[in-house]
């Protein structure tokens, strides 16, 4: 099964594509969709078009996207919600079922600690997918979203979560830190 993860943002939207087979996670692609400095409709159109292109290029079976959190600044929350909406429209237009997860669910599923830092997310994603370097923060969150969906969507053993994949690599999580 191929999963497309999306980390929505008005300036930068992260994406990550993984293949899941049993307990095995395999990296396919990741990166960002950058919007131009332009009016809001143009930026939202760029996100929609970018997501649509990703679906055509990578042919995912399912998608996962981060739920909007309420920011201190209501204007920022509204803009993020619009960017997320543009991404969801692209996913649905591409015929994908879309799952939504909170940042807490994402961090808990990937790192094993709901208050994990960006750096901890990057490190764990790189280890779980056997990457040679750390992905950028937006791409790491998007890859993490795909991993979270693989876990929550019963593609990985939900009783063991990501523990079997970590154990095979000689790793475990202790106090939010990856140890080996």
Swiss-Prot record:
It holds the Pfam family RuvC. PROSITE patterns: RUVC. Its EC number is 3.1.21.10. InterPro entries: RNaseH-like_sf, RNaseH_sf, X-over_junc_endoDNase_Mg_BS, X-over_junc_endoDNase_RuvC. It is an enzyme of class 3 (hydrolase). The active site is at residues 7, 66, 138. It catalyses: Endonucleolytic cleavage at a junction such as a reciprocal single-stranded crossover between two homologous DNA duplexes (Holliday junction). Mg(2+) 1 binds at residues 7, 138. GO terms for molecular function: crossover junction DNA endonuclease activity; DNA binding; magnesium ion binding. Binds 2 Mg(2+) ion per subunit. Mg(2+) 2 binds at residue 66. The keyword Metal-binding applies. Belongs to the RuvC family. HAMAP family: RuvC. The RuvA-RuvB-RuvC complex processes Holliday junction (HJ) DNA during genetic recombination and DNA repair. Endonuclease that resolves HJ intermediates. Cleaves cruciform DNA by making single-stranded nicks across the HJ at symmetrical positions within the homologous arms, yielding a 5'-phosphate and a 3'-hydroxyl group; requires a central core of homology in the junction. The consensus cleavage sequence is 5'-(A/T)TT(C/G)-3'. Cleavage occurs on the 3'-side of the TT dinucleotide at the point of strand exchange. This is Crossover junction endodeoxyribonuclease RuvC. It comes from Burkholderia thailandensis (strain ATCC 700388 / DSM 13276 / CCUG 48851 / CIP 106301 / E264). The lineage of its organism: Bacteria, Pseudomonadati, Pseudomonadota, Betaproteobacteria, Burkholderiales.
């Amino acid at each position: 099964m191929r999963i497309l993860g999306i980390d929505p943002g008005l300036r930068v939207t992260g994406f990550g594509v993984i293949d899941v087979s049993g307990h095995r996670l395999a990296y396919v692609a990741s990166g960002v969709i950058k919007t131009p400095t332009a009016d809001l409709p143009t930026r939202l159109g760029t996100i929609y078009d970018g997501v649509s292109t990703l679906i055509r290029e990578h042919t995912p079976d399912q998608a996962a996207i981060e739920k909007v959190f309420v920011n201190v600044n209501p204007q920022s929350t509204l803009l993020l919600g619009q960017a997320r909406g543009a991404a969801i429209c692209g996913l649905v237009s591409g015929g994908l079922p879309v799952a939504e997860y909170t940042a807490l669910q994402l961090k808990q599923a990937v790192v094993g600690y709901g208050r994990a830092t960006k750096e901890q997310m990057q490190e764990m994603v790189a280890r779980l997918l056997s990457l040679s370097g750390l992905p950028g923060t937006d791409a790491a969150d998007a890859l993490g979203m795909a991993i979270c969906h693989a876990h929550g969507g019963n593609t990985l053993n939900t009783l063991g979560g990501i523990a079997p994949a970590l154990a095979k690599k000689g790793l475990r999580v202790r106090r939010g830190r990856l140890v080996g």
